[in-house]
């Protein structure tokens, strides 16, 4: 009885991965904006998350976000090879948010993908679920009300809370802080 219930949950979570990926992308976009506006944030301290490896860097300089949006999804073979080499938690560390220019979510990929694009023109493909997890870890101690709200919503999405509407664009840029750090 327990086994079949667990198996049913696994199937239903697989079937709703696309919807959950869209919801997570919405809240991750808000977290990226909040992360970039928080002046004194420290990198998350957890040994279970691996730092991104140079081999996952997309092998050319990127001219614009449109180029990343139109890039093909990883094949199932490429995805399985990455998981075999780096594990399912293969994701960037906190230091990889320093010069972040844009984050692009590709929910149409299976599994969904996220691409981090930096001011230097380089881009790194990452697992969007673990990217969101790192953002939550980085922001959990922040006392700002809006940060606490977005973190709680993202945690609710992971726990099977209500889904939210997908944004009109999948190119999400961190908000710019006003002059003087306001």
UniProtKB/Swiss-Prot annotation:
S-S pairs: 73-109
Function: The heterodimer glycoprotein H-glycoprotein L is required for the fusion of viral and plasma membranes leading to virus entry into the host cell. Acts as a functional inhibitor of gH and maintains gH in an inhibited form. Upon binding to host integrins, gL dissociates from gH leading to activation of the viral fusion glycoproteins gB and gH.
Protein name: Envelope glycoprotein L
GO biological process: fusion of virus membrane with host plasma membrane; symbiont entry into host cell
Organism ancestry: Viruses, Duplodnaviria, Heunggongvirae, Peploviricota, Herviviricetes
Natural source organism: Psittacid herpesvirus 1 (isolate Amazon parrot/-/97-0001/1997) (PsHV-1)
Lipid biosynthesis found in the keyword field: no
Occurrences of domain gL alphaherpesvirus-type (ranges): 52-182
Domain of life, per lineage: Viruses
Membrane association type: Peripheral membrane protein
A GO cellular-component term linked to this record: host cell plasma membrane
Entry similarity comment: Belongs to the herpesviridae glycoprotein L (gL) family. Alphaherpesvirinae gL subfamily.
Signal peptide feature range: 1-39
Record localization: Virion membrane; Host cell membrane; Host Golgi apparatus, Host trans-Golgi network
Subunit structure as annotated in this protein's UniProt entry: Interacts with glycoprotein H (gH); this interaction is necessary for the correct processing and cell surface expression of gH. The heterodimer gH/gL seems to interact with gB trimers during fusion.
Record keywords: Disulfide bond, Fusion of virus membrane with host cell membrane, Fusion of virus membrane with host membrane, Glycoprotein, Host cell membrane, Host Golgi apparatus, Host membrane, Membrane, Signal, Viral envelope protein, Viral penetration into host cytoplasm, Virion, Virus entry into host cell
